[in-house]
Amino acid sequence: MRNIFFKTAVCLITAIISFSLSASQREWKDAPGGLPYYKYTGSSDADPSFLIGNSHIKVKTHLDGIYEMISGERCWARFNADPVRPDYGKNRATVYLNKKRINLVGPGSLATVPGKCEVYSGAGFVRYDYDLGNGIKCSRMISVMPSQTPADTAPLFLVTLTFENTGSAARNLSYDEALSPYFVQASHQLIHEAERPLRYNMSTDISFRCIKASFGPVPQDFVPLAVPQNRAKDEFAPQSIFLYSANAFLVVNEGELKASIEDFKVRARKKHTFHIVIGFSGDDNKGLAEAVIKKAEDSQFGAFSSMWKKHLPDFSAEKNKDVRNELYRSAYSIEASMVYSDYFKETFIPGKFLYASRFGENISNSDHINAALQACYTNPSLAKSIIRYVMKQTSFDGIIPDSNKGFGYISSDQYTHNLTQLEVLNVLAEYLMRTGDYEFLDEWLTVYPMERGEVQSVKSIIERYFIYIRDKAYVSATMSSMQAAVLPKFLDQMKKSGKLSAEFIDAFQKYTDKAVEHFNSRNEYASADIQYLLESKLLTNSQKRDILDEAMNKGSVDMRAIPGLSSFDGIEASSLFRTLILKNDASDDADIMDAWTIYSYFRIKE
């Protein structure tokens, strides 16, 4: 049984991974006075996904209207998972018109019928526009608010239903919005339910206008139970979820949390709108839901479109519409994928959201820290949180693990030799250059494992990075290129800060001089290291030109080359940037290259 399930799951995952939402499947438009959005124009046979979210909730919606309610705040998990289909959810939206039941979402629903449904997506929203027949139009829109701060935001989404009667006679309708709570940890979704280490019993509680569903872990094998705030591979304290509606009759029926709005009338040439809130449970679900509904805008481009416009970087000065659309898409994708870690108490940007949400592993700290480069320009508090997130995972000897999984769990084999320390120093230097926040160097951080409560100063962590880099027995060509670009830049910021000891500055200066001497002694430079070579102040423009030409001939130039290229040839950097961004065919799921795109844009502007 397990083998059959696993093979089926792998086939489904492979099919989903192979599909990406290309530029040709988007018809971009500009909302009046707002942000760009697009209409999906691809085949209904495909299964693209549209990610909306903030640091506390992810809603991955499918073309057929099914959504996955996802969180990475603790273990990456789905809270309305389909029991038999990985990477899919279980929810229902049903209209009753003229005694006829019309399913709006799911396989075989109206959402999959050509000509009966159009799908639009933009910053913070996905909208499905239906033609129900008999002169009745229906819009079902899912919206999320942006994160107010990296750690603070509303962990919920708003479902806005609008029925419009274009006919000459009033119509009576009924509507159900429901989801089926079923908790599945991402790392377990390819394991048959009977063979997972834990299963989860659901319990529900109905109060005024709210239904709450909670999940209790039940071991199915020998699994030492963990304290909820202690690191663990498996989830022992899943978040609870809730559904709120001021207009509906709420009921738990056959495992569904259901909001039913029965027999309402839509008069001729009139509209009828109502809201349903679904999210992660807190101290006052009703109060939070009502506060969010009050902030909802009467806009078909997202219930919080004005908030998103204010929150995202302003790219309106970009004259090339296609480039501008991609900039907004990349910036929004970063915001939609970033996640607050309850274990580390910091927010980070997953380098690969698809991987994290599918397999439950945050890969990799190298990607996470590089994603902070763009945040130095767009959201310095987020950049700082990412730096802290990576620093908190550092071992006593200065090694940074490649990744973590579960609830803050880092296995011993993740502490491998890598070059992430140099990347942290690079981002820290960039952050200090942009903000002048030298007081950050005096801060103390609680370090891994967090439950022990051990604190270390940022300065001591920096010193351990330096010792680790200095004492490496072998310096590769890539490491040499990185050192030439990073060490002088970082040393300059440490001197300006006045926070590090004279002994440290002297030792760092000596090592930097040695690294520069080693770099200058090289006769060849690998085009694979182009992002560091172009950033280095030790090469002439002529040398950089040769390196760039070689890399372009090999087809190995991507967005990571742009920041360094901008330092010696701004016109070419701008041209190459626009060429690369228009080749971007990535899906809406945020990727590290989205972060490099935004960072490159701001570097070019300097």
Model region roles, listed by residue range:
Residues N98-L156, S245-S260, Y332:
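Extended, loop-rich substrate-binding clefts of extracytoplasmic carbohydrate-active enzymes
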Residues A23-N91:
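Beta-strand-rich N-terminal accessory domains
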Residues A232-A303:
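Beta-strand-rich recognition/accessory modules
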Residues E361-S480, A573-L576, L580-N584, M593-E606:
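Aromatic-rich carbohydrate-recognition surfaces in CAZymes
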Residues A9-S18:
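Bacterial N-terminal signal peptides
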Residues S364-N379, K459, T478-K496, D506, ...:
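Active-site core of glycosidic bond-cleaving carbohydrate-active enzymes
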Residues P86, S143-N253, D298-M307:
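Polysaccharide-binding surfaces and accessory modules of carbohydrate-active proteins
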Residues S24, F301-F359, S385, Y389:
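Low-complexity, Ser/Thr/Pro/Gly-enriched N-terminal "stalk/linker" regions
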